[in-house]
């Protein structure tokens, strides 16, 4: 469906993609599982623009599956500076994103919303905006998803492979995040937990399951 930008893509402005996936309906005040995409859900191939090159990171599949079973929205929040830099366009992003979602469906897991920000200080034309509020580490994508899905951000979790993901989570009011291949750290009001092995993945799955139980109690 075309939007007010006049493109066939779900752009709310030239550098912001917001797409609702599937028809799952959620009651208000649920937490969400926020996920970075490149380097978290799929292998990061440096500005991925070819759907044929997309490979999932299997570590994330049980986390998404657990959130799906728990009735918790799964929301992808991804910076896409390759678009701002002119390496590829929104059509290539759409093709890659479609492939990621297709591979996830083949594994029996589902995403409920995708948000992407293409703004970057090194961009060209209207995308050359430094420190755009939607670009992580700013919290704009998480906050916008929170408004659209009526989420409880404080109870939500974020998983990503960069400190910018954790900073976005903290600024959005989340209490904890999991850093792929990272180190644990505690900041005022926010805990960064490492995600490097099966034991630490178990901690993430337990946290998601706890949110599901809290929602049913």
From Swiss-Prot:
CDD domains in alphabetical order: HAD_HisB-N
Pfam families on file: Hydrolase_like (PF13242)
Residues that bind substrate: 36-38, 44-47, 78-81, 135-136, 162
Keywords annotated in UniProt: Carbohydrate metabolism, Cytoplasm, Hydrolase, Magnesium, Metal-binding
Family: Belongs to the gmhB family.
Complex and partners: Monomer.
Name recorded for this polypeptide: D-glycero-beta-D-manno-heptose-1,7-bisphosphate 7-phosphatase
Gene source species: Mesorhizobium japonicum (strain LMG 29417 / CECT 9101 / MAFF 303099) (Mesorhizobium loti (strain MAFF 303099))
Gene: gmhB
């Amino acid at each position: 469906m075309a939007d007010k930008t006049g493109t066939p893509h779900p752009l709310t402005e030239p550098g912001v993609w917001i797409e609702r996936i599937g028809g799952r309906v959620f009651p208000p005040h649920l937490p969400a599982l926020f996920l970075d995409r490149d380097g978290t859900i799929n292998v990061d191939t440096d500005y991925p623009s070819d759907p044929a090159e997309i490979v999932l990171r299997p570590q994330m599949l049980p986390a998404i599956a657990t959130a799906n079973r728990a009735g918790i929205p799964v929301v992808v929040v991804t910076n896409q500076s390759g678009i701002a830099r002119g390496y590829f366009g929104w059509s290539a992003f759409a093709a890659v994103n479609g492939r990621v979602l297709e591979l996830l469906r083949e594994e029996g897991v589902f995403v409920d919303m995708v948000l992407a920000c293409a703004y970057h200080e090194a961009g060209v034309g209207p995308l050359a905006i430094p420190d755009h509020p939607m670009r992580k580490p700013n919290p704009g994508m998480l906050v916008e998803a929170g408004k659209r899905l009526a989420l409880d951000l404080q109870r939500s979790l974020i998983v990503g492979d960069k400190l910018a993901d954790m900073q976005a989570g903290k600024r959005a009011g989340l209490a904890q995040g999991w850093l792929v291949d990272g180190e644990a750290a505690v900041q005022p009001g926010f805990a960064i937990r490492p995600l490097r092995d099966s034991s630490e993945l178990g901690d993430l799955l337990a946290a998601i399951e706890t949110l599901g139980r809290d929602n049913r109690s």
